[in-house]
Amino acid sequence: MPENMNRHLTALEFDKILSRLAEFTACPDARELAMSLRPESNLDLVQAQMNRTRDAHMLLARFGGPSFGGLRNVNNAAARAGAGSTLSLRELLDVAEVLRTVRALAQWRSTNAGVETVLDPLFSALQPNKYLETKITSA
């Protein structure tokens, strides 16, 4: 980032704004993403992100917020399982919790499915797996 941009961000106390935003995140990965945000100059990208924010705010205002409390990064565990490795009990429980969170989020969205948003492709990408979730938690 150009030096003059850093001066402007410092003057605006941008780091404090990011810290306040990060306080509202549900998991360490989201916190890291929030802290890494930087101003964007591409108008199309800014407009797309503003539309996402608008629609997320509208859904929250109309239907309340879903729970994201069980989010954990299980990428390493998924990759190891995909390669045939055995997962630890902690990793299995983390996977089950992520599956529960995905299922709850998909259910939350289905209760307000009559409202179209630019977030719909993200919600459509969610793939709940109640069978696997139950197999892990009942073992």
Label the predicted regions.
Residues 1-139:
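Conserved amphipathic alpha-helical "coupling/scaffold" segments
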